[in-house]
């Protein structure tokens, strides 16, 4: 049999058979993923298979996802306007509350204007290709989120990947490429979703100004939590108004759904005409926009929420470190990773914690690099402190039993 014959035979196999083989390979490598149905989110807990357990796996950092005031705001607009936008916003799906939310988000982030998208993924795969193309170069942090990586690839720009948070190497790349491309775009996260650390955005701005590069910061995990006003990593690093493209999400600290990009009026007007993932999709349901507007208001007028997040993060990190476990990120960072390494062992720890009444994230490749599978623990303002202490004790106990 020739190689061509073998290839043809493989291609002609029934889909179910070929895909089942791939699933079995994922299973053997400890990389097969499944979903679980959770409901009745309340005070940092959820119902799972009829049992109420502590949820340390969500991104509901401020505890707003189940706030009744947010639900009432959505309900009022739901009754008045129905369930959906009905069309893309450029056709007949633009609602006054979309405009109100965009103005509020722009003000919150210290930008001129903002544009809503259905998700953060859709922001990144739409905005980046609208700004750069094959004539340009992108500098991307090696630990950037998959949506940023995909947006960079879709742009067809040359992509230079620099070591995580390494401004010296980024500067060397910018120097080496000086004058070779039409545009240079530096793409980073404000808070890295799997490591919990903050990019040094003040240094980023200095480099960008020196080399004439544009800056793109996805602050999905900083928004609502970091900074004196809770506006995110950009405020935390003291560079409000100095980032060219600011991305944020509604589905994490603000507890609703959707995302946005903010910047100058000119930027937003261009994206309205060029970002394909905005143009060719139905508008956000007005009720969800209403919920987001109320959640944003609460995040601003209830600063106790972000301080509670920081207190709980400091407590959890301190207990884990006292128990001999290394955790990365800032001392009060709300994302607490505990690297285990092997994906199968990681999921075994997750399963045992679940049996004990704690839901934590088990993160494996390709979400994180091979050999760095981990627990991803996230704290919420509404977690009782005694629950944080109980989690830390159980994590340490399970890890001792797994690793000795």
Residue ranges of model-derived segments:
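PLP-dependent aminotransferase class I/II
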Residues: 247-249, 253-320, 325-328
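Active-site phosphate-binding strand-loop segment of PLP-dependent enzymes
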Residues: 160, 164-217
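N-terminal "arm"/small-domain region of PLP-dependent enzymes with the aminotransferase-like
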Residues: 15, 19-83, 213
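Conserved PLP-binding catalytic core of the aspartate aminotransferase-like
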Residues: 307-317, 321-357, 367, 371-372, ...
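Conserved active-site segment immediately N-terminal to the catalytic lysine
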Residues: 212, 232-250, 269-273
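Conserved PLP-anchoring active-site segment centered on the Schiff-base-forming lysine
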Residues: 127-146
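PLP-dependent enzyme catalytic core of the Aspartate aminotransferase-like
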Residues: 1-2, 68, 72-76, 80, ...
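Conserved N-terminal alpha-helix of the aminotransferase class I/II PLP-enzyme fold
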Residues: 72, 76-119
């Amino acid at each position: 049999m020739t190689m061509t014959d073998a290839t043809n035979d493989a291609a002609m196999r029934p889909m179910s058979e070929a895909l089942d083989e791939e699933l079995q390979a994922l299973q053997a490598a400890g990389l097969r993923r499944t979903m679980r149905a959770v409901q009745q989110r309340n005070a940092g807990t959820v119902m799972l298979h009829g049992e109420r357990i502590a949820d340390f796996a969500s991104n509901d950092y401020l505890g707003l996802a189940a706030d009744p005031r947010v639900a009432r705001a959505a309900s009022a607009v739901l009754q008045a306007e129905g369930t959906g936008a009905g069309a893309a916003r450029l056709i007949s799906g633009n609602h006054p509350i979309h405009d109100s939310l965009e103005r509020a988000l722009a003000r919150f982030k210290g930008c001129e204007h903002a544009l809503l998208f259905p998700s953060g993924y859709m922001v990144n795969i739409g905005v980046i290709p609208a700004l750069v193309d094959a004539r340009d170069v992108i500098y991307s942090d090696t630990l950037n989120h998959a949506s940023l990586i995909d947006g960079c690839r879709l742009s067809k720009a040359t992509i230079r990947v620099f070591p995580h948070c390494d401004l010296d190497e980024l500067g060397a790349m910018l120097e080496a490429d000086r004058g070779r491309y039409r545009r240079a775009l530096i793409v980073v996260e404000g808070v890295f979703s799997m490591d919990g650390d903050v990019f040094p955005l003040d240094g980023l701005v200095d480099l960008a100004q020196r080399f004439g590069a544009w800056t793109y910061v996805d602050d999905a995990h900083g928004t609502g939590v970091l900074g004196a006003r809770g506006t995110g990593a950009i405020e935390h690093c003291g560079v409000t108004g100095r980032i060219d493209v600011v991305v944020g999400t509604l589905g994490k600290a603000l507890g609703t759904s959707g995302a946005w990009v903010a910047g100058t009026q000119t930027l937003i007007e261009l994206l309205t005409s060029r970002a394909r993932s905005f143009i060719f999709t139905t508008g956000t349901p007005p009720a969800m926009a209403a919920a987001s507007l109320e959640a944003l208001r609460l995040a601003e007028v209830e600063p106790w929420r972000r301080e509670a997040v920081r207190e709980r993060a400091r407590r959890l990190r301190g207990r884990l470190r006292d128990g001999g476990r290394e955790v990365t990120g800032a001392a009060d960072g709300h994302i607490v990773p505990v690297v285990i390494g092997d994906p199968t062992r990681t999921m075994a720890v997750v399963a045992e914690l679940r049996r004990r009444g704690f839901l934590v994230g088990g993160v494996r490749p390709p979400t994180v690099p091979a050999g760095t599978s981990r627990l991803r623990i996230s704290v919420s303002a509404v977690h009782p402190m005694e629950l944080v202490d109980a989690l830390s004790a159980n994590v340490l106990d399970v890890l001792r039993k797994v690793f000795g």
